A protein has these predicted regions:
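Low-complexity, small/polar and acidic-rich linker and loop segments
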Residues: 1-119
């Protein structure tokens, strides 16, 4: 999938449509899928990541702003678009579907070597 990363009038911090647009990024039931004969629940990591970004957005709003929210808006949109461009599709086991920490997101991952950017 080809995606052009750019500033967007969508997915704002506190625009009239912000809550609806951010909520639409995560499918119903928070994106949990059930696999195998025992219907074991998993959450694709991208939905966990996008939900976390929305939580950060909402927390920022409750703390108030200094009147200049262009940088947080830029950062949220940049991270959102980056996640959509290269999503982590690893499945995270659901440990408590009704708890505040519903999934076990930690563990071994095969990742690109990010250290090369520091060389």
């Amino acid at each position: 999938v080809s995606m052009f990363v750019e500033n967007s009038r969508h997915y704002g911090l506190d625009s009239p449509d912000a809550n609806t647009e951010w909520a639409a990024l995560v499918p119903s039931e928070d994106g949990v899928i059930h696999i195998g004969p025992e219907k074991t629940p998993f959450l694709p990591a991208i939905f966990h990541q996008l939900k976390c970004l929305d939580i950060i957005r909402q927390a920022y709003l409750t703390e108030g702003t200094d009147g200049n929210n262009s940088l947080p808006r830029h950062c949220l949109n940049y991270l959102r678009q980056s996640l959509l461009c290269r999503p982590d599709l690893r499945l995270e086991p659901v440990v408590d579907p009704f708890g505040p920490h519903a999934v076990q997101p930690y563990g071994r991952r095969t990742c690109q070597d990010w250290r090369v950017v520091y060389k």
